[in-house]
Design a protein with these regions (language model features):
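Structural signature of tandem-repeat unit edges
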Residues: 1-9, 20-35, 45-61, 71-87, ...
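Short beta-strand elements of solenoid repeat domains
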Residues: 13-17, 39-43, 65-69, 90-95, ...
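Short, aromatic/basic amphipathic alpha-helical patches
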Residues: 297-300, 316-329
Length: 334
């Protein structure tokens, strides 16, 4: 209570590694001049009760990894935080694996640039209310919700993603996610979508018809093991800059129809792209050019021999017949 923090400007790593700390009451702290709270409670693995309700965060600009690995923390209320000057929230709550309640009601995020891995591995969270988030300046959302294994529905209709360049692993391992509305997403500046929906095992449908992928270079494992998806229309996808599609639909075991009619494949890695898509009946790849593909190893492994594969011309048909003699239903597009 006699600890005077009125002139402190940085509390970076202040309690880092205090792994035996169970309760911490910092309500009396004067934090009005603090600009940096990054790593402040990093690896406080036993911390169950944290009182920071009196924090004045008007000058705070860095919350990066602030609560990272507070793996015993069950509840966290930041509704009193003024985050109007914060620019980075990278890994702020990452690996808070016991967190059940997270109140971010009044968070102001209009200056935040980096939200990568922000909630990654919050494995006990059932829902996150981020309806008030302003993401108009965010450029990095990589891994943002990855491994949030209990979240069933996620509404991101308020998200402005016009400046985002990285969405890799954004929803990776969201194994309980059933409903995901991304119809408002502007992806025109996104470069990296690798692993974006990897292991979203419960997703039965997803609408990506508004996605602009004209600048994307990496789609590695983008839908890997989306084992409940039955149909996927990606006919709007532009893949002229994509060089890696390896395992993109690997183990989409319920998929029956896949429309990739606008996909081009010049100098791409297609290794294992459709591997274990065991139920697929129609595969529209009418703009694929296999002659320029870098790697096609196991591309059709464990798919039905009579799957209808639509290609653009006889050159592609003959190439497939030569290299995959087990495929019996290759047709040239009308």
């Amino acid at each position: 209570s006699n600890f005077n923090t009125s002139n402190v400007t940085s509390m970076q790593s202040m309690f880092e590694g205090c792994s035996n700390l169970i309760e911490l009451d910092l309500n009396s702290f004067n934090t009005s001049k603090v600009s940096n709270m990054s790593y402040m409670f990093y690896k406080c693995k036993s911390l169950k009760m944290l009182n920071i309700s009196g924090f004045d965060t008007i000058n705070l600009n860095n919350m990066s990894r602030m609560f990272w690995y507070c793996s015993s923390l069950i509840s966290l209320d930041l509704s009193n935080f003024d985050t109007s000057n914060v620019t980075t929230m990278e890994r702020t709550f990452a690996d808070c694996s016991s967190l059940v309640s997270l109140n971010l009601t009044n968070l102001i995020t209009n200056k935040v640039v980096d939200m990568s891995y922000m909630f990654n591995s919050c494995k006990s969270l059932i829902s996150i209310d981020i309806s008030g988030f302003n993401t108009s300046n965010v450029t990095n959302m990589e891994g943002m919700f990855g491994f949030c294994q209990k979240i069933v529905t996620l509404s991101l209709t308020n998200f402005n993603t016009s400046k985002v360049t990285k969405m890799a692993n954004m929803f990776q391992e969201c194994v309980s996610l059933i409903d995901l509305n991304l119809t408002s997403f502007d992806t025109s500046n996104v470069v990296d979508m690798r692993g974006m929906f990897q292991n979203c095992k419960s997703l039965t449908t997803i609408n990506l018809l508004n996605f602009d992928t004209s600048n994307v270079t990496n789609m590695w494992r983008m839908f890997l093991n989306c084992s409940s998806l039955k149909e996927l229309d990606l006919s709007n996808f532009t893949t002229s800059k994509v060089t890696n599609m390896e395992s993109m639909f690997h183990a989409c075991v319920s998929m029956t129809e896949l429309d990739l009619s606008n996909f081009t494949t010049a100098e791409s890695n297609l290794k294992g792209m459709f591997m274990y898509c065991e139920k697929i009946e129609i595969l529209n790849i009418r703009n694929f050019d296999f002659q320029n593909v870098n790697n096609y190893e196991n591309i059709f492994k464990q798919i039905k021999s009579n799957v209808k594969i639509i290609v653009k011309d006889n050159t592609q048909k003959n190439w497939l017949n030569t290299n995959f003699s087990n495929l019996t239903n290759i047709v040239v597009a009308d």
